[in-house]
Amino acid sequence: ESRITLWVPRIHEQHTRRIWNSNSRVSPDIRITSTNRPWTQARYSDLAITTGGQSSIEALCLGVPTIALPELAAQKDFVYFLSSIGACISVPDFATADLRHLATTAIATKTLRESLSRIALQTIDGGGSSRIIDTVRSLI
């Protein structure tokens, strides 16, 4: 299937509509899914639009290219770090950003999505659980 899938977790439908303009419809080639269960939808998505919280970490783990719209200070710091290493596209000012253009460009540019995905996967080494177990054992 040549359809592009956007994963939009934890972002209200009204914000998603703003991305595409309230009076326009999303292209029939684009499917938007907003489930908060990444293991069921995100891993099959071509692009994620997140707020820079836990869903961004889930997208990293799954290698899903991400556009981040941070809302809280901690999210802004995390998104700044991710964007500085090329793991996501940061949108620091949601109110003035041309999100439709940004999302459309990211969707249309396969090399950009592949680069974001590759860098995202490189930031996750899969050893977090082992390090936690080792730390807990060292305390016992």
Sequence positions of predicted segments:
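Nucleotide-activated sugar donor-binding and catalytic core shared by glycosyltransferases
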Residues: E1-I140
